[in-house]
C-alpha cells in the first residue's frame, strides 16, 4: 500500500470493492475483487508522511513527527461508511476534524449488518 500505509476503517460496496482509509497519510483507497488497488483521495503531505513512515520503522516516532501529519478536509482519516437513502454517499470519519465530510459515489455500499433483525 506504499509509504504511510496505516490502514484503518473499511467498508464494502455492492460490487465487492473494499474501501478504506489510511489514518496518518490522509488517504481513501479501494481494492476491487481482482485485487487492484487505487487511491481515491490523498490529502496528506508526502514529505511529512514519509518522515512518519521512516520514524515508525526505525522506532523513533515523536509527537512532533506524528502531529505534523493530518491535514486537508479530514485530518487523520479514520473511517468510511456508506449512507443516505440510496447508500451512495460516503461519510468520512476523522480523528482531528470538527465535521463529517461526505461525497456521492456511483456505487452503493453494502448495508450494515446491524440494520436488520435477521442478523
Where are these regions (language model features)?
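Beta-rich, blade/repeat-based domains predominating
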Residues: 1-20, 25, 49-51, 60-89
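Active-site donor-binding loop signature of nucleotide-sugar glycosyltransferases
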Residues: 1, 42-43, 105
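Short loop/turn segments that connect beta-strands within beta-propeller blades
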Residues: 31-36, 104-108
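Short secondary-structure boundary segments
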Residues: 22-23, 43-44, 93-94
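Outer membrane beta-barrel transmembrane domains
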Residues: 54-56
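Blade-level signature of beta-propeller repeat domains, shared across WD40, Kelch, NHL, RCC1
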Residues: 76-119
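Beta-propeller fold detector
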Residues: 38-52, 111-119
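Loop/turn residues immediately N-terminal
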Residues: 24-26, 97-98
Amino acid at each position: 500500500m506504499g509509504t504511510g500505509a496505516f490502514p484503518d476503517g473499511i467498508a464494502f460496496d455492492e460490487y465487492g470493492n473494499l474501501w478504506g482509509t489510511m489514518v496518518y497519510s490522509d488517504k481513501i483507497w479501494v481494492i476491487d475483487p481482482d485485487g487492484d488497488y487505487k487511491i481515491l483521495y490523498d490529502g496528506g503531505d508526502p514529505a511529512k508522511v514519509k518522515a512518519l513512515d521512516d520514524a515508525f520503522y526505525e522506532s523513533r516516532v515523536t509527537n512532533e513527527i506524528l502531529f505534523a501529519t493530518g491535514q486537508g478536509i479530514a485530518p487523520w482519516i479514520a473511517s468510511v461508511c456508506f449512507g443516505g437513502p440510496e447508500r451512495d454517499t460516503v461519510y468520512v470519519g476523522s480523528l482531528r476534524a470538527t465535521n463529517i465530510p461526505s461525497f456521492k459515489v456511483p456505487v452503493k455500499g453494502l448495508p450494515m449488518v446491524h440494520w436488520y433483525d435477521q442478523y
